A protein has these predicted regions:
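Active-site glycine-rich loop that binds ribose-phosphate moieties when present
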Residues: 144, 168-171, 185, 192-196, ...
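Cofactor-binding loop segments of dinucleotide-utilizing enzymes, especially the Rossmann-like FAD-
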Residues: 82, 164, 188-190, 228, ...
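N-terminal amphipathic/hydrophobic targeting modules at extreme N-termini
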Residues: 1-11, 20-22, 26, 39
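Position-driven detector of the extreme protein N-terminus
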Residues: 2, 31-33
């Protein structure tokens, strides 16, 4: 009896250790359990787990049901969650964004039918989990995020971040700067996020790009902000951005038109400069994305959001984020579903992605 128990315990820990070394790849074999079937050599690229291998109601909720790995080593790109909302000024809940975005990503498939992008044909991509932020301390969380992104970037991996509130853009940009120097920025948002302080605090979700300019992280003449709108305290709210050289595209300029011509201008403006894309879900109209902390009416449409991201194809993208998804304010998961799709679209425009004929 005791011997059987010891054998079972040994088998459990042996299997747990073995699972850490599993490599994944697509397969048409449906008779063998997927975790065995997908063990391959080191040259095999990871693939999302398909609906014919595991029902979409099953499996572990990673982004696109990709493998979860412990670090960015050996990856070309990674999905990483930052479950943080200590910097919010209105409705909290963005800390649950990464988890819900992963859950709603279950229907995403590897091939982009519209653009013909096939990111998993050429890039090694995985979900590396979440940054272990400190839910009791904003400044400690910022430091932790910087450390984690330094570790990601040292491997040459491009992070696609699932937020989390927009405060996280600052520590990410600091790490990006240490790796790439000053970068260009495409910033989609209802708000400029260039407040000097919020309730006396220098670091919050409304201040990251003011700090980024002050710290010399951005090329001001290569920054484009799209979708800004709503009420403010003074005209200076947006004028400060223009004084730094930013191209400010208010939402009213986007109404009832394609944004493809705008993205032609953005690509010309940025050229081959390394660029970071920061996409706040509240840039999109709350009719499509109600689950966010600071909604503003009359925003961008979903097709316009796709035009912006797809229009970034060909740029030297070094990282991107999708932030401010707050699931508690959207019981149907629509906002997180949109966020998951936009994160996938960001993956599809990274350098090195192949396109099938």
């Amino acid at each position: 009896m005791k011997i059987d128990v010891y054998v079972d315990i040994f088998a459990f820990f042996f299997a747990a250790g073995a699972r850490k070394t599993v490599r994944y790849a697509a397969s048409n074999d449906t008779a063998t359990p997927h975790w065995k079937r997908r063990k391959m050599n080191d040259h095999t690229r990871f693939q999302p787990l398909g609906g014919n291998e595991m029902p979409r109601c099953g499996g572990i909720a990673t982004m696109m049901r990709l493998p979860h790995v412990q670090s960015a080593e050996g990856l070309d790109a990674c999905f990483v969650g930052v479950p943080f909302d200590l910097g919010t000024s209105n409705r909290t809940g963005a800390r649950f964004g990464p988890r819900q975005i992963r859950t709603e990503s279950v229907l995403l498939r590897p091939y982009n039918m519209a653009t013909r992008a096939a990111p998993f044909d050429s890039l090694q991509v995985a979900d590396i989990g979440d940054v272990a932020i400190n839910p009791y301390n904003l400044h400690d969380s910022i430091a932790r995020i910087e450390v984690e992104y330094d570790a990601i970037l040292k491997h040459g991996c491009k992070p696609i971040t699932l937020g989390g509130d927009h405060t996280i853009a600052l520590p990410i940009l600091r790490a990006i700067h240490r790796k790439h120097g000053k970068v260009a920025l495409i910033h989609v948002d209802a708000h400029a996020d260039v407040n000097d302080t919020m309730m006396g605090e220098k670091i919050a979700h409304g201040t990251p790009f003011r700090r980024a300019v002050e710290e010399g992280l951005l090329h001001g003449d290569k920054v484009t902000q799209i979708g800004l709108r709503g009420t403010g305290y003074a005209a200076e709210d947006f004028d400060w951005c223009r004084e730094q050289g930013f191209r400010v595209v208010q939402a009213e300029e986007c109404w009832n038109k394609s944004l493809a011509p705008l993205m032609d201008e953005v690509r010309e403006r940025i050229g081959d400069t390394p660029v970071y894309i920061s996409f706040d879900i509240d840039g999109i109209d709350p009719a499509y994305a109600p689950g966010t902390g600071t909604p503003e009416i009359a925003g961008l449409t979903v097709p316009q959001a796709l035009e912006i991201i797809r229009g970034a194809k060909g740029l030297n993208i070094v990282g991107c984020d999708l932030v401010e998804v707050a699931p508690p304010y959207d019981p149907f998961g629509t906002t997180a579903l949109l966020g998951a799709n936009l994160a996938y679209e960001l993956l599809c425009v990274l350098p090195g992605v192949t396109y099938r004929d």
